[in-house]
Structure formats: structure tokens, C-alpha cells
Amino acid sequence: MSKICQVTGKKPVVGNNVSHSHRKTRRRFLPNLQTHRFWVENENRFVKLRLSTSGMRIIDKNGIESVLAEMRARGEKV
């Protein structure tokens, strides 16, 4: 399963670990992904999404129906 938020599209970015002596080694910064089930009243079913915590806040703000409509408009299968 890929580490990409289904709502925001956030994915891992690459950076450096920097030691006290300023030696740099490559590392990945992973998004804070959570699997969450949402009840969709219009469809009378649960929808399971893998999303970042900022994606959860977007759903809290805009509502699950409007977010699902945007995802389907992008061509994502939900």
C-alpha cells in the first residue's frame, strides 16, 4: 500500500539527517497517514480512506460527501 494521502495527495519527501558534526545522510519524511472509516449517509455505507491528519481536518471542515465528489471528479475510485 502506497504512503499517499487520498485526499491531499501528500506523499513522502526526501531530506537529510544532520549530525552534530554536520554530516548528512539521506532520509525520508513520511506523512502522518491514518486509515479511517467514514459513514456516508447518501450511499448508506462506510467508506474506508487512507489519509493524512490534515486530510481528516479537510473532511471535518467540508464534509465527507463534498470530498468524495472531488475525489471522483479526479478519477479516483472510492
From Swiss-Prot:
Transmembrane segments: none annotated. InterPro entries: Ribosomal_bL28, Ribosomal_bL28/bL31-like_sf, Ribosomal_bL28_bact-type, Ribosomal_bL28_sf. Gene3D superfamilies: Ribosomal protein L28/L24 (2.30.170.40). GO terms for molecular function: structural constituent of ribosome. One of its GO terms (cellular component) is cytosolic large ribosomal subunit. GO terms for biological process: translation. Keywords: Ribonucleoprotein, Ribosomal protein. SUPFAM superfamilies: L28p-like. Belongs to the bacterial ribosomal protein bL28 family. PANTHER family: 39S RIBOSOMAL PROTEIN L28, MITOCHONDRIAL, LARGE RIBOSOMAL SUBUNIT PROTEIN BL28M. This is Large ribosomal subunit protein bL28. It comes from Hydrogenovibrio crunogenus (strain DSM 25203 / XCL-2). The gene is rpmB.
